[in-house]
Amino acid sequence: MEEIKKYLKLEISQQRNFIYPLIFQEYIYAFAYDRGFSRSILILSENLGYDNKSSLLLVKHLITRIYQHNYFIIAPDDSNPNPFWVCSKNFFYEIILEGFAFIVEIPFSLKLISCLEEKNKKIVKYQNLRSVHSIFPFLEDNFSHLNCLFDILIPHFVHTEILVQTFRYCITDVSFLHLLRFFLYKYCKWNSLMTPKKASYSFSKSNQRLLLLLFNIHVYEYESFFVFLHNHSSHLRSIHFEVLLERIHFYGKMECLINIFIKLKDFHANLWLVNESCIHYIRYQRKLIMASKGTSFFMNKWKFYFITFWQCYFSLWFYTRRIYINQSSNHSFEFFGYLSSLRMNPSVVRSQIIENSFLINNIIKKVDTLVSIIPLISSLAKAKFCNVLGHPTSKPIWADLSDYNIIDRFGCICRNLFHYHSGSSKKKFLYRIKYILRLSCARTLARKHKTTVRTFFKIFGSELLEEFLMPEEYVFFFTLSKASCSLQGVYISRIWYLDIISINNLTNYK
């Protein structure tokens, strides 16, 4: 118990006042629109030679640098404002809120950097681990040997006061906490965001950065407690545990864990070691997946531990009857826009001993990743690229743009989707998405020029084809076209990229 109290009691040096960046006032508007600021703080802090990566001098230098590239400055005290630049009250609140979200992210980015530095790891290596695709090779290597898994949806409704109290453990700045509470209650309709049926909230979906960050911090607190209790309750330590902290998604892996029985009344745990080789824990946003090669009885005990611990200490309530434990060979789960499952590949081996020969049937388990085509088409339908049945439609809102911008926008969306879903074992679903986007582009251009799609394809068909070709396809079609080899590998090969640090909005349909 004393060790737990020491863990919960933070050192004074770790408690910082995070309200000071707000004194820059007009600079809030500047850095609110810099999407790469969290990445630049890592790079510039090393290049400029600062020891304290959260120093006031560094923050001011970075904000000034961003501000110099901001040519459109809105002056609220202007006596003769231009009607074109007059913005609503909520618009300024959105800007301040996004800047406020950036300030909240600072301590957690520093926490990750310090964690990597303690282990003598270079930040350069960390850049590859930030990729969304980095988790899928891990699934391919480990999930094929596991038997049981369960995936649950974490309840999204959390009272705003609970989120504020989460910060009280690490921040002593009272004004910061009051300002955070003010934003959550006054301008962020958290209940509307957390309840799917209520779609009316003050800010746009792209400006939910602070709300999603606070929710992930709340869940991360639970996960850190979980690892701490495990490591201090047995002599069996985790072989590997890493936390890759991003804005909206976290990833963790724990091996050689222990079996835990819970007494529901006082929540004291009886712990002892079991002969369980490993458990894998993965979470992205609200999706939580646990997998093991143990029995369903073992997984049931883990399930009740998670639920009880979450309800008692974090006020998140689960419906236990809706959480099922499935056999990995008969269950598929959606994760990061992919539909993952275990595929059984039978193979026959002929063995011969002297004069006798016989056949041996082997079954090899392999993780198969497919594109979730139905939700992806639903996302395209919501974005007005097609109807609910997948029939392409024009995009009237883009009809006023130039031909180049229209083709470039459609081509960019298509390339991004192909790039992200390059790990799919079946590419034919992606070519259906390409067909929808290409025909939607043609209908948008035909609508603009007041002509038919057939006539437009006769004139610009080849240019549209080149715009929608992927870099991988260029390689196969132009490099391998001279060789007498089959192009079947184009449709079945899987490629995982290490430069994807965010999910396309069309893929992140949930």
UniProtKB/Swiss-Prot annotation:
GO cellular component: chloroplast
Keywords: Chloroplast, mRNA processing, Plastid, RNA-binding, tRNA processing
Domain of life: Eukaryota
Pfam family of the protein (one): Intron_maturas2
Location in or out of the cell: Plastid, Chloroplast
GO BP terms: mRNA processing; RNA splicing; tRNA processing
Plastid in keyword set: yes
GO MF annotation terms: RNA binding
InterPro entries assigned to the protein according to its UniProt record, in alphabetical order: Domain_X (IPR024937), Maturase_MatK (IPR002866), Maturase_MatK_N (IPR024942)
Disulfide bridges in this chain: none
Presence of keyword Magnesium: no
Biological function: Usually encoded in the trnK tRNA gene intron. Probably assists in splicing its own and other chloroplast group II introns.
Assigned protein family: Belongs to the intron maturase 2 family. MatK subfamily.
Protein name according to UniProt: Maturase K
